[in-house]
């Protein structure tokens, strides 16, 4: 392995599989910082559905990727990748290890394959889809 090439570490898995406890243990033993890769944890106030680390755990190990945006705002993969790149770059400057932890497959895959920066959906299309949903429900969108 190239010593000059930084390494990212990953823990991924389904909800309630023990990722958080394993991540805390590994991060403490390996002097690492944790970057959350959870598409729900990025939102402020979404604490139950995302199993965010406790304040105590956050004081033991530096965490990133939590509470980045108000729940009523749009936060997409391109914003997450820009944020994650900044966190990783700064950590490497400090010679700190980064452990990426999460169960959001789409966000995790973005570390390994290219994604579209941003998909712009016109207001006309949004209105059309919304009208279809109101008229026919979810089955109309399938």
Predicted regions and their residues:
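Phosphate/pyrophosphate-binding catalytic cores of soluble transferases and nucleic-acid-acting enzymes
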Residues: 1-142
């Amino acid at each position: 392995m190239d010593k000059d090439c930084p390494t990212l570490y990953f823990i991924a898995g389904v909800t309630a599989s023990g990722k958080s406890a394993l991540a805390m243990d590994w991060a403490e033993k390996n002097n690492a910082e944790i970057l959350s890769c959870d598409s729900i944890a990025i939102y402020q106030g979404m604490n139950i559905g995302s199993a965010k680390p406790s304040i105590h755990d956050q004081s033991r190990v530096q965490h990133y990727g939590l509470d980045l945006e108000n729940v009523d705002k749009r936060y997409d993969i391109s914003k997450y990748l820009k944020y994650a790149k900044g966190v990783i770059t700064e950590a490497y400057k400090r010679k700190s290890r980064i452990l990426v932890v999460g169960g959001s497959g789409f966000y995790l895959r973005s570390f390994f394959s290219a994604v579209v920066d941003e998909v712009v959906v016109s207001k006309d299309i949004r209105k059309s889809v919304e009208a279809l949903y109101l008229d026919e429900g979810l089955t109309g969108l399938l």
